[in-house]
Regions:
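A conserved beta-strand-to-alpha-helix junction within the catalytic ATP-binding
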Residues: 9-21
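Conserved micro-motifs of the catalytic ATP-binding
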Residues: 3-6, 43-46, 119
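Detector for a conserved hydrophobic position within an alpha-helical segment of the HATPase_c
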Residues: 135-136
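Conserved glycine-rich
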Residues: 140-141
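ATP-lid-like helix-loop hinge signature
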Residues: 63-88
């Protein structure tokens, strides 16, 4: 999958994230999405469409993961928590969910970025590899953190 070259412009990541959350909650309002941010605005020189795709894909993965878990586990809090903040040099994004998590992967967590690697019945395995490419093109780094309940994803962009 070839990505078009990013077109960099100054965009507000807070409103970009809010747009994606709103869209995903219209598609599925059974999950509580909490968005915490320290600033009114976080401006970042980025390709708006591409970063929007990253936000959308990652939150959608969290939603699907929570649904997957709810097929087996009945009583748990269906939460996604998203945090966006900045320092002088970096912008940090943390997405934390209560879904199935990464602990039950039969493989190394690093493999989830490989093209065509998928754990979904109808997955193509391209979602996260595209997400990773976009993040790299934006001077960023993605990290997958295992935790007991659910998954945590950290992305750090250099300004």
């Amino acid at each position: 999958a070839r990505m078009p070259k990013p077109i960099f412009q100054n965009n507000d990541l807070i409103s970009l994230m809010n747009d994606n959350i709103k869209l995903l909650q219209e598609l599925d309002n059974s999950i509580n999405i909490k968005f915490v941010n320290s600033d009114q605005k976080i401006l970042f020189n980025c390709d708006k469409e591409q970063l929007s795709r990253v936000f959308f894909n990652l939150i959608k993965n969290s939603i699907e993961s929570i649904h997957q878990k709810s097929e087996k586990v009945t009583n748990f809090k269906k939460n996604i928590s998203i945090e966006l903040n900045q320092t002088d040099e970096h912008i940090n994004l943390i997405i934390d969910d209560t879904g199935v998590g990464f602990n039950n992967l039969d493989t190394d967590i690093k493999n989830i970025l490989n093209p065509y690697f998928t754990t979904k019945q109808k997955g193509t395995g391209l979602g996260l590899s595209i997400v990773n490419k976009i993040i790299n093109d934006h001077n960023g780094n993605i990290e997958f953190v295992s935790k007991n309940e659910g998954a945590k994803i950290k992305i750090i962009f250099s300004k």
